[in-house]
């Protein structure tokens, strides 16, 4: 069963893979995009009962892990940029209709980690964009725009992508999302859509019942002036 030791081990595996990719492509800058669900909070009572740590412990541990990961990445790259959106798993109430849209514990995890890392000279922390309440963010890499979106409000389908683009009022180069626990990729009218996996994978009661199972993974994209040049769905054990 997924626990803190497994999480540390998988982050170590991910760091080793990123180091190899950085050397292979001679990359100078890294964008760490936090796509939400950094903890498993209150949205699903069954998941909450299966959690090994309570929510407060999860916030503290996730913040420490993230801070250490950012520090390790800063040792590999000349410049590191950190941007975050919030996920549904960190809301404070099980009923999403009662939840305040921007009230997510992911914000505390990110604040904890980035506060510890703000002294690092080559690490830049992005502030949330006004008007989106932490549900969306937009970054620019080598002149191309990338929309960051957890995915609970926007479906990973052609219709979902079209609706999001209409809402934004512009066509981004790529949309990077998560939410479904498994990596995926598609293109919608030249917009690259990347769905990230998750560190824990599937296997708890909720993901089994809803057929959301997936092996633990994280996705690393190498971006050039043309957009996403290479994509690595990194499997973790």
Task: Show which residues each predicted segment covers.
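Core catalytic region of metal-dependent phosphoesterases/phosphodiesterases
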Residues: 3-119
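Conserved beta-sheet core of the metallophosphoesterase superfamily
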Residues: 103-107, 115-122, 127-133, 142-236
């Amino acid at each position: 069963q997924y626990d803190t030791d497994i999480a540390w081990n998988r982050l170590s595996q991910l760091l080793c893979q990123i180091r190899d990719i950085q050397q292979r492509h001679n990359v100078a800058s890294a964008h760490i995009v936090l796509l939400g669900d950094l903890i498993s909070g209150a949205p699903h009572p069954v998941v909450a009962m299966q959690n090994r740590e309570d929510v407060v412990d999860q916030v503290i541990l996730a913040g420490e892990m993230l801070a250490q990961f950012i520090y390790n990445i800063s040792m590999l790259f000349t410049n590191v940029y950190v941007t975050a959106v919030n996920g549904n798993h960190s809301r404070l109430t099980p009923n999403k209709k009662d939840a305040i849209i921007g009230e997510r514990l992911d914000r505390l995890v990110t604040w904890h980690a980035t506060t510890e890392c703000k002294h690092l000279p080559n690490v830049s922390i992005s502030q949330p964009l006004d008007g989106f309440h932490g549900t969306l963010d937009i970054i620019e890499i080598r002149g191309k725009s990338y929309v960051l979106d957890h995915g609970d409000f926007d479906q990973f389908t052609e219709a979902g992508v079209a609706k999001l683009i209409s809402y934004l009022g512009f066509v981004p180069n790529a949309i990077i999302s998560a939410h479904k626990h498994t990596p995926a990729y598609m293109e919608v009218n030249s917009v690259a859509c990347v769905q990230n996996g998750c560190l824990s994978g599937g296997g708890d009661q909720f993901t089994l019942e809803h057929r959301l199972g997936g092996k633990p993974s994280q996705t690393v994209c190498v971006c050039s002036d043309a957009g996403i040049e290479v994509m690595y769905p990194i499997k973790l054990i």
